[in-house]
């Protein structure tokens, strides 16, 4: 599953690209639901700051 690092700027690009809706706005940054994530990498591909990383 992917994890979103603290470099996240909360732009929402990742959530819009997630085919299984595994990403949502957290308290300060976006968060990935690891149980739902299918490791497709779409979030990492569209993130302008490279915050999503594979775990």
Swiss-Prot record:
Domain 4Fe-4S ferredoxin-type: 2-27, 28-55
Cofactor(s), by name: [4Fe-4S] cluster
Record keyword Metal-binding present: yes
Binding site for [4Fe-4S] cluster 1: 8, 11, 14, 47
Any one GO molecular-function label of the UniProt entry: metal ion binding
Details of cofactor binding: Binds 2 [4Fe-4S] clusters.
PROSITE patterns per UniProt: 4FE4S_FER_1, 4FE4S_FER_2
Keywords, alphabetical: 4Fe-4S, Electron transport, Iron, Iron-sulfur, Metal-binding, Repeat, Transport
Residue positions binding [4Fe-4S] cluster 2: 18, 37, 40, 43
Record-linked PANTHER family: PHOTOSYSTEM I IRON-SULFUR CENTER, PHOTOSYSTEM I IRON-SULFUR CENTER-RELATED
Protein function: Ferredoxins are iron-sulfur proteins that transfer electrons in a wide variety of metabolic reactions.
Protein name: Ferredoxin-1
Organism of origin: Rhodospirillum rubrum
